[in-house]
Amino acid sequence: MVRRFVPVVRRRVGVMVLGLMTGICSAGVVHAQDAPKANPYIFAGDGAVLLNFVKADHVADFDMIIGKLKDALAKSEKPERKQQAASWKVFKAGEAGPGGAAIYVSVVYPAVKGADYTVTTILAEAFPTEVQDLYKKYAESFANPPGNLLNIKLLSDMAK
């Protein structure tokens, strides 16, 4: 009876070891793959309103990034960047946000259809040697929550 039981236990242990090895090897393969590239920031509606919550002690850095973004759009040779600049306004709210964060409101209307509004992509086009430092300052400036995006569709133009 013991002889009949031992081969069954060995088989079960063998199957468990095989399963564990398969899992470990699979995890290693998944880990070794390249990270997917970020999707472009393309607005789905006629325009967008973006609220950014910026840490109070990083306001100067964020203001600098917005200035660099304006410069990047202005000096770009791409026609869609000129169109983006023409319809993109950034405001700073007088009221504080969560945890005392400064609130920045970007209004993009009309949005350029199919254009990528990723700030770091635009900065990288204009300032390739500075982009790592700019990205670091940009990323570190956000509070929690970092912001909120609203894709907007025109309901009524009161002037028409």
Spans of features found by a protein language model:
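Bacterial N-terminal signal peptides
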Residues: 12-26
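N-terminal secretory signal peptides
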Residues: 34-94
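Weak global preference for isoleucine
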Residues: 24, 42, 51, 65-66, ...
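N-terminal secretory signal peptides that target proteins for export/translocation
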Residues: 1-11
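An amphipathic, aromatic/His-enriched active-site/gating alpha helix that lines ligand/cofactor pockets
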Residues: 34, 70-86, 98-101, 107-160
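Generic detector of low-complexity/intrinsically disordered segments
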Residues: 7, 20-23, 151-152, 156-157
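Boundary at the C-terminal end of the N-terminal hydrophobic targeting segment
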Residues: 27-34
